[in-house]
Amino acid sequence: RFRDRIAAAIRARLEVADQELVRRGTTLFSLPMHAADGAKAIWGTADRIWTALGDTSQDLNWYTKRATLSAVYGSTVLYWLGDNSPGHQATWEFLDRRIEQVMQFEKLKGSLRENPLGKALMAGPGKVLERIRAPKLPDDLPGRPFG
């Protein structure tokens, strides 16, 4: 399941991190003058996870996937910093609950899309939102596929 791959990616990211360094970095990024850099770091992690998992979205989904994963990842990091359970088991359970909540929200969005009233309400905003595209990166950078 895709949700298991996302959980595994977040877990792998946290397991290679030094908890004390992350704690200190979180403290630094909580200061107003560094908050934008902290948000950029979380967004970058979410982007790398989605890219590693093969995300090919080019529309609004590109942004919503990364925003949602940023929220899940950020909250999981904060939980992980305070977790003293053996093997961080409480953190992994917390992560599973967050992903389950995202899945419930996605199901709700799907049911709204299928509902005639939901379709009617989203017709106008949908026309505007379908114009949003993922950013285009230069294809001549190292590590980027050509094409």
Label the predicted regions:
Residues A7, F29, D37-A39:
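Amphipathic alpha-helical interaction segments
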Residues D55-A120:
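Hydrophobic/aromatic-rich alpha-helical bundle segments in the mid-to-C-terminal region
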Residues L108-G147:
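Long, charge-rich low-complexity segments
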